[in-house]
Regions:
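N-terminal glycine-rich phosphate-binding loop and ensuing alpha1 helix
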Residues: 1-66, 97
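Catalytic-core segments of class I nucleotidyltransferases/pyrophosphorylases
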Residues: 121-123, 130, 135-143, 155-158, ...
Length: 258
């Protein structure tokens, strides 16, 4: 099953960093967040990726075209241009890098990948969020309901600690960053049948999270896989610092691979 990765947005909330490189290429522990997401899928045996490029897509193309230069030590013979790779850090991945337009919206980018998917089910997620989700269990769940789409949902942590205050304004308890308001939100990590493409009808201007998803839900074609454990997007510099802190302290829950 192919995995589509949305990697073309402008990342405006991280403009301090995305003025230089696209958001999926921002580092966690010296590796792009996109690499971390792909490692999760690969751990469960899914190694055929289609990366949907847009803003600064060249940086992503260059990374994979020169993967060994980024991941390994090399010796280059300048007399003939030959290169010897040391401590080979190869991956069992097949990576298609698909230019989907600078200003295309999410639905438009997905629609442009239709010819690469054909009539088979596929997976889809955003290139800016990591999770310890069990992809194998997600796919099994999708096969149980027979509908067009499974969307993973999560309950994000609150941004701030919460106070439990009695009637006299006495603080009885402090909870450090509890779950938010209890709502389940779209966490990406979709499994889709090909009929999902039929719901994307507005070309490059189609926002996948608006009419396509709304109409799929209206037609009772969407089930959700509730993920109760770790999920975190990289939306702000604060998120980036937190993810790096987790990685550098060997406490990264999404590191399911060995």
């Amino acid at each position: 099953m192919k995995v589509l990765l949305l990697a073309g947005g402008f990342g405006t909330r991280l403009s301090e960093e995305t003025d230089i490189k696209p958001k999926p290429m921002l580092d966690i522990g010296g590796k792009p967040i996109l690499w971390h997401i792909m490692k999760t899928y690969s751990h469960y045996g899914f190694n055929d990726f289609v990366i949907l490029l847009g803003y600064k897509g060249y940086y992503i193309k260059e990374y994979f075209a020169n993967y060994f230069l980024h991941q390994s030590d090399v010796t280059i013979d300048m007399s003939d241009g030959s290169m010897e790779i040391h401590n080979n850090s190869s991956e069992p991945w097949k990576v298609t890098l698909l230019d989907t337009g600078l200003d295309s919206m999410t639905g438009g980018r997905i629609k442009r990948a239709q010819d690469f998917i054909g009539d088979k089910p596929f997976m889809l997620t955003y290139g800016d969020g990591v999770s310890d989700i069990n992809i194998e269990e997600l796919v099994k769940f999708h096969k149980t309901h027979g509908k067009a789409m499974t969307m993973t949902s999560a309950q994000p942590d609150g941004r701030f600690g919460a106070l439990n205050i009695d009637d006299n304004n006495k603080v009885k308890e402090f909870k450090e960053k509890p779950k938010g308001d209890g709502s389940w939100i779209n966490a990406g990590y979709f499994v889709c049948e090909p009929k999902v493409f039929d719901y994307i009808v507005d070309g490059d201007s189609s926002v996948f999270e608006q009419e396509p998803l709304m109409n799929l839900a209206r037609d009772s074609e969407v089930y959700t896989y509730k993920h109760h454990d770790f999920w975190m997007p990289m939306d702000t510099l604060r998120d980036k610092h937190k993810l790096n802190e987790l990685w550098n302290s060997d406490k990264a829950p999404w590191r399911v691979w060995s």
